[in-house]
């Protein structure tokens, strides 16, 4: 999978939104985000149903439940990124797309279309989960008891920073060469590991679409802003640090009137 060799900031060409490659990439983001959120949120609903029927407490609040949820997220994201990587780059996360935008690896038009696709994919996944589970409300994310807003925000910043840094080092860095299956595997593993760290405190979302779908369908908005602000700050920090401190310094490419040639679907 090729990557853009140089940073190129700009809004994008007017015809980029209707270009066949852009449409295919947007569809890939929609489908992969759907697959990821359906499996990830579904694993939580499945555990809750099992524990509601056989115990007095929710399964996700137990050590075993935490491990199972982390594994489900890791496996699902590994599969989702692998499925989309050669078409869209396999973002499957608005925060990853934002980091690529901040780093000059995608145009603003491409980022907007990815965000819309990712959010719609997450919403559809949660709607189908509610339908197929006979009305169970998606759980989504909220801060645990005793965890303040600042604590949760900083935790989401750190967790997302780690995720996007791994994405940059395995997928975006133009010096990396082809890593094949290692890239989506590494991304899935860091998400699983981060859930083991942050799950008991903030839920470890790291993904605004992953948080938005359950919040909308389950109508659970408590602390929701944290799961947008934290991941976006963390992704921007990771992108800027990797672009300007890890990747050799290069002058940004500017084009007339803020417009540049659209990047290929996998160039981010």
Curated annotation (Swiss-Prot):
Cytoplasmic side: 2-26, 86-108, 168-178, 247-268
N-acetylmethionine carried by residues: 1
Recorded GO MF terms: channel activity
A UniProt-annotated Pfam family: MIP
InterPro entries: Aquaporin-like (IPR023271), Aquaporin_transptr (IPR034294), MIP (IPR000425), MIP_CS (IPR022357)
Gene3D superfamilies (alphabetical): Glycerol uptake facilitator protein (1.20.1080.10)
TM regions (residue ranges): 27-47, 65-85, 109-129, 147-167, 179-199, 226-246
Example of a GO biological process term: autophagy
Tissue expression remark: Predominantly expressed in developing embryos (seeds). Also expressed in green siliques.
Topology of the protein relative to the lipid bilayer: Multi-pass membrane protein
GO annotations of cellular component type: central vacuole; plant-type vacuole membrane; protein storage vacuole
Main location (coarse class): membrane
Side of membrane Vacuolar, spans: 48-64, 130-146, 200-225
Keywords, ordered alphabetically: Acetylation, Membrane, Repeat, Transmembrane, Transmembrane helix, Transport, Vacuole
Statement: the UniProt record of this protein carries the keyword Membrane: yes
Subcellular location: Vacuole membrane
Domain observations: Aquaporins contain two tandem repeats each containing three membrane-spanning domains and a pore-forming loop with the signature motif Asn-Pro-Ala (NPA).
Family annotation (NCBIfam families): MIP
Entry similarity comment: Belongs to the MIP/aquaporin (TC 1.A.8) family. TIP (TC 1.A.8.10) subfamily.
Protein name from the UniProt record: Aquaporin TIP3-1
Source organism (scientific name): Arabidopsis thaliana (Mouse-ear cress)
